[in-house]
Amino acid sequence: MKRIPRKTKGKSSGKGNDSTERSDDGSSQLRDKQNNKAGPATTEPGTSNREQYRARPGIASVQRATESAELPMKNNDEGTPDKKGNTRGDLVNEHSEAKDEADEATQKQAKDTDKSKAQVTYSDTGINNANELSRSGNVDNEGGSNQKPMSTRIAEATSAIVSKHPARVGLPPTASSGHGYQCHVCSAVLFSPLDLDAHVASHGLHGNMTLTSSEIQRHITEFISSWQNHPIVQVSADVENKKTAQLLHADTPRLVTWDAGLCTSFKIVPIVPAQVPQDVLAYTFFTSSYAIQSPFPEAAVSRIVVHTRWASNVDFDRDSSVIMAPPTENNIHLFKQLLNTETLSVRGANPLMFRANVLHMLLEFVLDNLYLNRHTGFSQDHTPFTEGANLRSLPGPDAEKWYSIMYPTRMGTPNVSKICNFVASCVRNRVGRFDRAQMMNGAMSEWVDVFETSDALTVSIRGRWMARLARMNINPTEIEWALTECAQGYVTVTSPYAPSVNRLMPYRISNAERQISQIIRIMNIGNNATVIQPVLQDISVLLQRISPLQIDPTIISNTMSTVSESTTQTLSPASSILGKLRPSNSDFSSFRVALAGWLYNGVVTTVIDDSSYPKDGGSVTSLENLWDFFILALALPLTTDPCAPVKAFMTLANMMVGFETIPMDNQIYTQSRRASAFSTPHTWPRCFMNIQLISPIDAPILRQWAEIIHRYWPNPSQIRYGAPNVFGSANLFTPPEVLLLPIDHQPANVTTPTLDFTNELTNWRARVCELMKNLVDNQRYQPGWTQSLVSSMRGTLDKLKLIKSMTPMYLQQLAPVELAVIAPMLPFPPFQVPYVRLDRDRVPTMVGVTRQSRDTITQPALSLSTTNTTVGVPLALDARAITVALLSGKYPPDLVTNVWYADAIYPMYADTEVFSNLQRDMITCEAVQTLVTLVAQISETQYPVDRYLDWIPSLRASAATAATFAEWVNTSMKTAFDLSDMLLEPLLSGDPRMTQLAIQYQQYNGRTFNVIPEMPGSVIADCVQLTAEVFNHEYNLFGIARGDIIIGRVQSTHLWSPLAPPPDLVFDRDTPGVHIFGRDCRISFGMNGAAPMIRDETGMMVPFEGNWIFPLALWQMNTRYFNQQFDAWIKTGELRIRIEMGAYPYMLHYYDPRQYANAWNLTSAWLEEITPTSIPSVPFMVPISSDHDISSAPAVQYIISTEYNDRSLFCTNSSSPQTIAGPDKHIPVERYNILTNPDAPPTQIQLPEVVDLYNVVTRYAYETPPITAVVMGVP
């Protein structure tokens, strides 16, 4: 049976189909040429020398093309212009060394022209083991046995054929005017065209027909030169690999800070110094006379003021101090920091903003106390009154001055004074270390309790903060396991056993905390591409540094150099594709940016830019458009565009307009509509989704293309990443440990990978090449193409189909691993929605963030239009960059995958700041919940929170007011934790009056997925609430008075304080005879000397005298009028007005009770400074307490408080036995409960009613080592 010869699938000779079929695309002739150094080989029967030449690859041309990119071009002053008008130096001196070497090579080749023909035998290299006629590779040119290896024979043949003359950059033309004609193979110069043809024939080539045309060689040279120094082909140095961790971390927050000083935020300050009369100086009771240090100030008046960390010894200043001046000075600035722009130049503050400013002050109070109490060691006290107690050793040279303050019972004196009496009543053994040894198992104990001066509020705040960090604490074994999981096992992390347990490593974080922080990041991106682009660029740089894949464009040029073309062709497919893939005017980082985009397909959609599509839709008859289609078809599967499949289909449909017609169901989106316009699911043609609607007769190519897309488009997959059990997961719409991929993922080869042609992207490329071959073979679509051009195009596609690029295998095996390794450590964790391939119903159409719960919206301002944020950023990529990377990837020759990744990944996981992103997520979550809690105090958000400060005036904050308040909260949080970049900025725009954060994404079929992260408990918000509850009872300590004030003349010699007035001077709305001046009241002045009358709130006309009640707002709006009309009545005492304040800052003016004092000047000045937007601090005139008898003078008071507001008074005449005249106050034993009450438990506190000033403080001896000191990584 006669075997049917197989039709050639390789290169055509340029004159139609070859009559002689070959199975190896000219490889037999190549071996023959290399073995036979005697010149042109013997042709087979029926094949001319010209036809045989056309089937041979140009080995010399290939080598010259690859070598020429490495040497500079030597141009003569004169030359022949090429097709583009560029002049090349093609003239060589007759007596040059190049000519001599070329002639020598030519003569060497001519010696063997008479050698006999090589034998012919059969081989089984054909398809289906078909024996085809081919030259034997085991015989030499004489017919004898040849035992040399093929590689040796090829090298010898090449050295004989190719000149040793250094190659030039670019191939000069073969013809020249002037001095001669130069051979582009060996650089020999001939003197006529006939001599040149004969010379070229000695190379086995012909002057007009070459296997690699000069046009291709020129484009190869330009292609290689353009790529030579491009950043995408540069391999990162080891030094640069050590900097990879810098791309992973933002600012490291100051989460753990230590304070070795006193744990107190309330300071006892002397207000009025002690006054000693001369006649009793000899009988002084002052302990200072005996050089005894007192635990309390020795003064006539001492008060408690807020001063955070006034006795601290910290390692880092959070710069959030709240320092309140003594009440004898003006503290109004503390209550006008927020929302008081119009009052900055006056000495007043807006009373409607008091609550917001108080909340901000309380937040600063909490933030400045987020310290851990440092364990500093103990030493036994040798003084007699402590019974050998172990007292804490303080660092610093001035430690001694603090002991009397820390331990009041160390003092002992027989003097009689309020201080001494207090010390004598204390429980002596409640001092120093309590109930725990200092050393445990030979090391300092992990924590210890100590009795010392401290305030209960600060102790509680620091205790809660320590408990929060303790919940985040993880042991080295957990870190070892978690890092190994995150590194996918490529880095061996070990945790050496150590007996010490005094480690504090707060790195554990919950999923909910990471999800809330993730939503904040997503809101920050919104629709702004400038925010996400740097993120993707950093990840692309990181991928380039850790990836073994190297982009080597010479793989493309070497492949194209083997394409057979005719120099007489007007079009060159190989040259055209090389020109398309040059890096000019393109961002060739797009390949790895596309990979980075896989991590964020929920917030950014990577699309192919419009410039990559065929111009004006293109035409199938255009070679340029065909290559645009090829480049586009290869690049589209790597994007995250869910409409990429239909864009690929419509790109070819655009080019087939006029040749093939498909049914389009939309009058606007027709077949001629640009493919890039099909960017939403509703534009998908029905014929694409149901390919049976495409006629295989009327549109065979488009039907084939649709079938290819449906069958061979890459399938999505997933890979495991992270350690959510320890580090949490920010995934919102996917399981915690899942990373989605748009292509199939296969396990990576842990040793040395080999070339694989079975992966999805290689199959996809092969199908695209086959489709294009069908296009060029059909004369219907290419009526103007010659058979030579068709053959050349088919050959080019075959080369591209089988190009030896490692990129497709890398994308399927190693790229997912790289993404999974870096994803857990990124500052912006992956945000993904499921990839849908060709399922239009599941295409995501909307991703949005909601700030407000629909069930709790009570104001029109809280509409969804202002609280929703729609997310979505399109990011255009260059298809040429992606295609170049797909076609030119290679691995290092000695690559061992697991060893490579161990070296590349280790610097990331050995960095000391590897956990900074986790800690930032925790702080972000704390800040969000704190903001929600605080905003709910000044606006009606229906958020369930205790409102302890409702008695402080406040307006109902609008969105703008709440945004200003939120901005201050954000600034305070960033300052306290030493952060410089984004924290709560996304919430500052729009309406920050939020109650919850939720995120939704909607599919095209209408299905919606909602994720509402559960708000975990916020320690900072809880501490602010605790401080607010304490403030509700101890407001005087913070410089605020509660209740109203009464303005009226009261003259008396009784030395009472207006902060605690006699009850008979106070009246309210329920007091008989009291009139109320309401908003609608009117004053009617009397005629002919009659007293003025006022229509009160009940509508009755009454004389303007007696007791009246005015709302503060009414007085502010009519301050000028009231000041002019009422001052005379007030000064005479005929009129007393109660102004309803609610809360107000105050200022004390002490006077000598032995001298006459009148407070009218203070009162009138205060009334004059009231404006519609502000009130100053209310002035009170207070007598100085005296420890001896005095002769009291009358005092005239004009402003008194309606409630007791003297809780900040600590003691009067503390160094004396008693107070004789004026306000009297002993040292408050209720604030020293555990020191004065032996029945009180040692750990008892009286918050929120009373702030204890002596407590048990827990101090810690934890270490906070860097990660490198806890675990060891073995690369």
Curated annotation (Swiss-Prot):
<dbReference type="InterPro" id="IPR054176">
    <property type="entry name" value="Lamba1_VP3"/>
</dbReference>
<keyword id="KW-0067">ATP-binding</keyword>
<keyword id="KW-0863">Zinc-finger</keyword>
<comment type="function">
    <text>Inner capsid protein that self-assembles to form an icosahedral capsid with a T=2 symmetry, which consists of 120 copies of VP2, with channels at each of its five-fold vertices. This capsid constitutes the innermost concentric layer of the viral mature particle.</text>
</comment>
<dbReference type="GO" id="GO:0006370">
    <property type="term" value="P:7-methylguanosine mRNA capping"/>
</dbReference>
<feature type="compositionally biased region" description="Polar residues">
    <location>
        <begin position="118"/>
        <end position="149"/>
    </location>
</feature>
<comment type="subunit">
    <text>Homodecamer; each decamer is made up of two conformers of VP2, called VP2A and VP2B. 12 homodecamers assemble to form an icosahedral capsid. Interacts with protein mu-NS; in viral inclusions.</text>
</comment>
<keyword id="KW-0479">Metal-binding</keyword>
<keyword id="KW-0946">Virion</keyword>
<dbReference type="InterPro" id="IPR013087">
    <property type="entry name" value="Znf_C2H2_type"/>
</dbReference>
<keyword id="KW-0167">Capsid protein</keyword>
<feature type="zinc finger region" description="C2H2-type">
    <location>
        <begin position="181"/>
        <end position="203"/>
    </location>
</feature>
<dbReference type="GO" id="GO:0039625">
    <property type="term" value="C:viral inner capsid"/>
</dbReference>
<keyword id="KW-0506">mRNA capping</keyword>
<keyword id="KW-0862">Zinc</keyword>
<dbReference type="GO" id="GO:0016887">
    <property type="term" value="F:ATP hydrolysis activity"/>
</dbReference>
<keyword id="KW-0547">Nucleotide-binding</keyword>
<comment type="similarity">
    <text>Belongs to the turreted BTV-fold inner capsid family.</text>
</comment>
<keyword id="KW-0507">mRNA processing</keyword>
<dbReference type="InterPro" id="IPR044949">
    <property type="entry name" value="Lambda-1/VP3_sf"/>
</dbReference>
<feature type="region of interest" description="Disordered">
    <location>
        <begin position="1"/>
        <end position="149"/>
    </location>
</feature>
<feature type="compositionally biased region" description="Basic and acidic residues">
    <location>
        <begin position="75"/>
        <end position="117"/>
    </location>
</feature>
<keyword id="KW-0378">Hydrolase</keyword>
<protein>
    <recommendedName>
        <fullName>Inner capsid protein lambda-1</fullName>
        <ecNumber>3.6.4.13</ecNumber>
    </recommendedName>
</protein>
<keyword id="KW-1153">Inner capsid protein</keyword>
<feature type="compositionally biased region" description="Basic residues">
    <location>
        <begin position="1"/>
        <end position="12"/>
    </location>
</feature>
<comment type="function">
    <text>Displays NTPase, RNA 5'-triphosphatase (RTPase) and RNA helicase activities and probably participates in transcription of the viral genome. Helicase activity might be involved in unwinding or reannealing dsRNA during RNA synthesis. RTPase enzymatic activity represents the first step in RNA capping, which yields a 5'-diphosphorylated plus-strand RNA.</text>
</comment>
<keyword id="KW-1141">T=2 icosahedral capsid protein</keyword>
<dbReference type="GO" id="GO:0003724">
    <property type="term" value="F:RNA helicase activity"/>
</dbReference>
<dbReference type="GO" id="GO:0008270">
    <property type="term" value="F:zinc ion binding"/>
</dbReference>
<keyword id="KW-0347">Helicase</keyword>
<feature type="compositionally biased region" description="Basic and acidic residues">
    <location>
        <begin position="18"/>
        <end position="35"/>
    </location>
</feature>
<dbReference type="GO" id="GO:0005524">
    <property type="term" value="F:ATP binding"/>
</dbReference>
<dbReference type="Pfam" id="PF22033">
    <property type="entry name" value="Lamba1_VP3"/>
</dbReference>
